[in-house]
């Protein structure tokens, strides 16, 4: 029950109607016995983002999740950044201090959980990223810090892929990193790439789209993961599964990164069993 002691949290995004974060965070609050109310706050005009954050701080709002299109745009309006946010160059969680909000990033932890649930490991792996946006930065830094043998970044905008490759080299100069256009997949040697699809292609309502559909692409993979979680299994993952490859969907990443954010706000960390229960609950809320 909301009262004068309720801690208000929220989500900053545009658009916002599709988000599962209110369901996840309010369920976590119930499970963990926290007096929390988590609400969506849509900022339609990017020019008003700074004003929204200043107003939220003045009102005492305890924290936010941040998603598209504000994960990088929010940074100039913050008091500081946590280590992973600095590493990735993007923010998905704000934690209030008396002086302002500090930005954190729980995407890396969520992505690691998504892979670990399917026994997929970055150590010694040849990792192939599709995309070069915020989610791809998280995946790239996971490769850079997680012992990968090689990282290949493919993106329609090759300049963004090259910029991300440079950022990875700055973090881990010994890692072999290549960046190229999406079509470069045809030139890839071998068939042991752990591919992480990091774009929004295939997200509901465009669930019949896949960033790559050629069966020869999937022959080059050892496994496939997709950050998209609506639908639970994207067309990209269906094609990978049809090629006999293990797959990992983005819903586990969403749940895990949400749980890590909740811990930053409240100090409460849910158990692995509670995360599994939450995963089952959220599956029921996905679009048909």
Name each model-derived stretch:
Residues 146-172:
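NAD(P)-binding Rossmann-fold cofactor-contacting core
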Residues 145-150, 242-246:
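Conserved S-adenosyl-L-methionine
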Residues 2-120:
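Phosphate/diphosphate ligand-binding glycine-rich loop within oxidoreductases
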Residues 13, 105, 116, 124-145, ...:
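Glycine-rich adenosine-cofactor-binding loop
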Residues 8, 126, 149-150, 176, ...:
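Residues at the starts of beta-strands that form the adenosine-phosphate
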Residues 174-247:
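Rossmann-like adenosine-cofactor binding region
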Residues 227-288:
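Adenosine-phosphate binding glycine-rich loop
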């Amino acid at each position: 029950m909301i009262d004068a002691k309720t801690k208000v949290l929220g989500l900053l995004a545009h658009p916002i109607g599709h988000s599962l974060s209110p369901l996840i965070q309010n369920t976590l609050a119930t499970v963990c016995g926290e007096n929390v109310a988590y609400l969506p706050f849509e900022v339609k005009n990017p020019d008003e983002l700074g004003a929204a954050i200043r107003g939220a701080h003045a009102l005492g709002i305890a924290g936010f999740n941040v998603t598209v299109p504000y994960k990088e745009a929010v940074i100039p309006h913050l008091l500081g950044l946590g280590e992973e946010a600095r590493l990735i160059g993007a923010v998905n969680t704000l934690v209030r201090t008396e002086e302002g909000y500090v930005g954190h990033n729980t995407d890396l932890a969520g992505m690691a959980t998504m892979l670990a649930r399917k026994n997929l490991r970055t150590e010694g792996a040849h990792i192939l990223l599709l995309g070069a946006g915020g989610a791809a930065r998280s995946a790239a830094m996971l490769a850079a810090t997680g012992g990968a043998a090689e990282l290949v970044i493919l993106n329609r905008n090759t300049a963004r892929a090259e910029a991300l490759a440079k950022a990875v080299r700055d973090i881990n100069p010994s890692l072999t990193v290549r960046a190229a256009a999406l079509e470069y997949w045809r030139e890839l040697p071998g068939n042991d790439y752990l591919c992480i699809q990091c774009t929004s292609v295939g997200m509901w309502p465009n669930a019949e789209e896949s960033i790559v559909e050629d069966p020869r692409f999937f022959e080059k993979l050892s496994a496939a993961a997709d950050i998209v979680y609506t639908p639970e299994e994207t067309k990209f993952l269906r094609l990978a599964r049809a090629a006999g490859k293990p797959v990992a969907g983005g819903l586990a990443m969403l749940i895990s990164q949400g749980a890590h954010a909740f811990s930053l706000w409240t100090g409460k960390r849910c158990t692995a069993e509670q995360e599994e229960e939450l995963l089952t609950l959220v599956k029921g809320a996905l679009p048909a």
